[in-house]
Amino acid sequence: MKRIGITCYPTLGGSGVIATELGKMLAEQGHEIHFITSSMPFRLDRIYPNIYYHEVEISNYPVFQYPPYDLALAAKMAEVVDREHIEILHVHYAMPHAISAILARDLADHPVKVVTTLHGTDITVLGFDPTFKKMISHGIEQSDAVTAVSNSLVKQTKEKLGVKKDISVIYNFVNEQEYYKRNLNHIKKQYNIKSDEKVVIHISNFRKVKRVEDVIHTFSKIQSKIKAKLLLVGDGPETSTAFQLVKKLGLEQYVLFLGKQKNISELLSISDLKLLLSEQESFGVVLLEAMTCKVPCIGTRVGGIPEVVEHGKTGYLVELGDITQAAAYGIELLTNEEKWQAFSDDALVFAKTHFHSEHILKQYNELYDDVLSR
C-alpha cells in the first residue's frame, strides 16, 4: 500500500478527469489517496474509505495584489505530506503544480517523491511564454519522474524547452465501466432525432484552438448530402461565434447546442461520428471516449491525435483546415454501413488494446515503484 497525494485542476477538463479516475483506480487497489486541490474534483462522485480530500485555502491579504495560490498549495502539500506520511506527490501539469510540489518537498520533514504528468497546455501554450519557460523547465528537471500523455508531447517538450529529463509516455485512458456502447434510442427521441438521421458529435471547451467553426462547416457539407444532426457539447469563448455561424448557414434545425454535459457516454452511444478538428491536441481524450463507445472519429493530423486515431481503420486523419476532405470522409463512412461497422468495431478493439485502464494503471504502478526504489 502506497500513500499518494494527487493534485490536478478539479474542474471539467481532460487532465482533471484522468487524475481523478487514476486516484479512484489506485484506491480500488488498496492504496491511500489524498487529493490536494482548490475544490473537490468533480469526478470524485462517491465515497471511498481510502480517498481523502484536502482543500487548498487561499488567504486574501491586502499586501498581495493577487491571491498566492501556488504558495498556498505548496504549504498545504507539505502539511499533508508530514501529517499523512505521503510517499509520492503526483501532480498534473508542470505549471504551477510541479513547482508547488518541489517547494513542498523542500518544506516537508517527511521524505516525498514528486511525479509530474504533462498534459499539454503547460507546454504548448505556456511553454511559448518566456516568463514561464524557465519555470516550467525547472519543474520538469527537478521532478523525480516525469510522464507525458503522448510521444508528440514528449517531442514538443524537448524541442521547446530543451529539457534533458527522461520523460516516459503513459497514455490517457477512460473508465470502461462508464464508457461503453448501449442502446439509448429514447435519448434520440428526446432530442427529436429521427431514426433515419445520422448523429455527428463534437465535444470540447469551445476555445479557438478547437476550431469549432471547421466542425460546423464540415457538418454543413455532410448535411447537404445526407440526413444528419450535429450535437455540440461543451461551452466556452467560441460558443457565441459558433451559434452565429450556424444561423448564417441556416443550420439551426440541424445543430443542437447542448452546453456542458455529464452524460457524455450516453451522448456518444447515440452518435455515429466524432469530429475533432483542433489545431493542437496533446492526446484528445474525447477521441478515446468515442472509440470506447464504438464511434469512428475524424481528427486533424496534429499533436497526439495520430497516436489515438488509426487512419483508415478506426477513423480518418485530415490536414488542419481541410474541411472538404473531412466532410468527404464523413459522408463515405455514414453512407457505407458495412465500412462504418468495421470502423466501429475496430475503434473499440484499438482502444482496448492500446489504452485500457488496467494497462495504464500497471504502468503508473511500475513508475511509482521505480521512483520509491531510488
List each language-model region with its residue ranges.
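N-terminal strand-loop element at the rim of the active site
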Residues: 6-13, 24-69
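Conserved donor-binding/catalytic core segment of Leloir-type glycosyltransferases
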Residues: 194-210, 216-219
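Conserved acidic donor-binding segment of nucleotide-sugar-dependent glycosyltransferases
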Residues: 311-312, 316-323, 332-337
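Aromatic "clamp/platform" in nucleotide-sugar-dependent glycosyltransferases that forms part
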Residues: 260, 279
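Short hydrophobic beta-strand element within catalytic cores of glycosyltransferases
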Residues: 296-299, 309
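A short helix/loop element that forms part of the nucleotide-sugar donor recognition site in Leloir-type
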Residues: 180-193
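Nucleotide-activated donor-binding/catalytic signature segment of Leloir-type glycosyltransferases, i.e.
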Residues: 243-259
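Carbohydrate-associated surface elements
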Residues: 152, 173
